[in-house]
Amino acid sequence: MSVMALSQIRIPLLMGNSLNAWSEALTGFSIWGFPLGLVILAAIPLVFIALYALTYGVYGERKISAFMQDRLGPMEVGKWGILQTLADILKLLQKEDIVPAAADKFLFVVGPGILFVGSFLAFAVLPFSSAFIGANLNVGLFYAIGIVSIEVVGILAAGWGSNNKWSLYGAVRSVAQIVSYEIPAGIALLCGAMMAGTLDMQQITMLQSGHLGFAHFNLFQSPIAWLPFLIYFIASLAEVNRAPFDIPEAESELVAGYFTEYSGMKFAVIFLAEYGSMFMVSAVLSIVFLGGWNSPLPDLGPVSLNAMTSGPVWGVFWIISKGFFFIFVQMWLRWTLPRLRVDQLMYLCWKVLTPFAFIGFVLTAIWEIYVP
């Protein structure tokens, strides 16, 4: 009964379809006036919630890594080591913030900030439920694809500003990798947009709703959809520098890549940006191909499972669950697949993924035109 009551809540943290609509409805003013401050104030707790969740992504990775290696992982601080990450944050806050003497201090300082901002700006267009979205853009999918480019600037600033050859090598590798893999990733997402007929991420999600649950998801609407789905997942691993594409921070070659010289909270901010990007690409994959906030459970005869597990609160649960599932897969692959060489990385992008992405795009267009 309580679960059904929660699913009927229509006024969660945000009223309306976006923070903009919420602030305007609350005050009666235009978004260009006073409500803009309300939007910022409303976004602050969301950022802290995201930081809290991503912080425990580090704990999750350590536990998963330990499980893969038949270890226990963090166990000392708190029950099952659940407070270990908080202890690490306190430790990093007390660490000395070292800036190399020969570094470009401006670039060295702003690099992690640009990375962090670029990672979290994408959260603005992620529809967490029908009433929980920061900005409902009609080109939200393009925004999510393009915002990754900001991280390239931060990586270059961090690598060049460090005045360290290993940092610069790592930055150049990372930029080449991200820019290259944006092409197959973008084409794969356009296949999903073609199936929905819109670039609005909220509309893409709403078009995948229905009483049959997962059967309405884009991934199961066409046999061709599996191709762009797999291409985007592989390309997204490269975009966020996860194994087997973690060449920019290969420990045996580059120490720690473009953040070799960083310490203290700057080091922590770079890691938070990485985990933020991991969730972002996982959420985009879930929205475009797996229904986003929609429940995957179908109705079973007289039991309306889909209706019982739908609504704003359930929507947040479903999209976060789907996102964290793909984060788990990313962590799993880290201890399963060996690291690729640079030439293998580029070969996979330009001679395998990109041609297949174009093939998937053409086949999706043909399917949408000729198959009712």
From Swiss-Prot:
<keyword id="KW-1133">Transmembrane helix</keyword>
<keyword id="KW-0830">Ubiquinone</keyword>
<keyword id="KW-0997">Cell inner membrane</keyword>
<keyword id="KW-1278">Translocase</keyword>
<keyword id="KW-0520">NAD</keyword>
<dbReference type="GO" id="GO:0016655">
    <property type="term" value="F:oxidoreductase activity, acting on NAD(P)H, quinone or similar compound as acceptor"/>
</dbReference>
<feature type="transmembrane region" description="Helical">
    <location>
        <begin position="352"/>
        <end position="372"/>
    </location>
</feature>
<dbReference type="GO" id="GO:0009060">
    <property type="term" value="P:aerobic respiration"/>
</dbReference>
<feature type="transmembrane region" description="Helical">
    <location>
        <begin position="313"/>
        <end position="333"/>
    </location>
</feature>
<keyword id="KW-0874">Quinone</keyword>
<keyword id="KW-0472">Membrane</keyword>
<dbReference type="GO" id="GO:0048038">
    <property type="term" value="F:quinone binding"/>
</dbReference>
<dbReference type="InterPro" id="IPR018086">
    <property type="entry name" value="NADH_UbQ_OxRdtase_su1_CS"/>
</dbReference>
<keyword id="KW-0812">Transmembrane</keyword>
<dbReference type="Pfam" id="PF00146">
    <property type="entry name" value="NADHdh"/>
</dbReference>
<feature type="transmembrane region" description="Helical">
    <location>
        <begin position="178"/>
        <end position="198"/>
    </location>
</feature>
<feature type="transmembrane region" description="Helical">
    <location>
        <begin position="31"/>
        <end position="51"/>
    </location>
</feature>
<feature type="transmembrane region" description="Helical">
    <location>
        <begin position="217"/>
        <end position="237"/>
    </location>
</feature>
<dbReference type="InterPro" id="IPR001694">
    <property type="entry name" value="NADH_UbQ_OxRdtase_su1/FPO"/>
</dbReference>
<comment type="subunit">
    <text>NDH-1 is composed of 14 different subunits. Subunits NuoA, H, J, K, L, M, N constitute the membrane sector of the complex.</text>
</comment>
<feature type="transmembrane region" description="Helical">
    <location>
        <begin position="106"/>
        <end position="126"/>
    </location>
</feature>
<feature type="transmembrane region" description="Helical">
    <location>
        <begin position="139"/>
        <end position="159"/>
    </location>
</feature>
<comment type="function">
    <text>NDH-1 shuttles electrons from NADH, via FMN and iron-sulfur (Fe-S) centers, to quinones in the respiratory chain. The immediate electron acceptor for the enzyme in this species is believed to be ubiquinone. Couples the redox reaction to proton translocation (for every two electrons transferred, four hydrogen ions are translocated across the cytoplasmic membrane), and thus conserves the redox energy in a proton gradient. This subunit may bind ubiquinone.</text>
</comment>
<protein>
    <recommendedName>
        <fullName>NADH-quinone oxidoreductase subunit H</fullName>
        <ecNumber>7.1.1.-</ecNumber>
    </recommendedName>
</protein>
<dbReference type="GO" id="GO:0005886">
    <property type="term" value="C:plasma membrane"/>
</dbReference>
<keyword id="KW-1003">Cell membrane</keyword>
<feature type="transmembrane region" description="Helical">
    <location>
        <begin position="269"/>
        <end position="289"/>
    </location>
</feature>
<dbReference type="GO" id="GO:0003954">
    <property type="term" value="F:NADH dehydrogenase activity"/>
</dbReference>
<comment type="similarity">
    <text>Belongs to the complex I subunit 1 family.</text>
</comment>
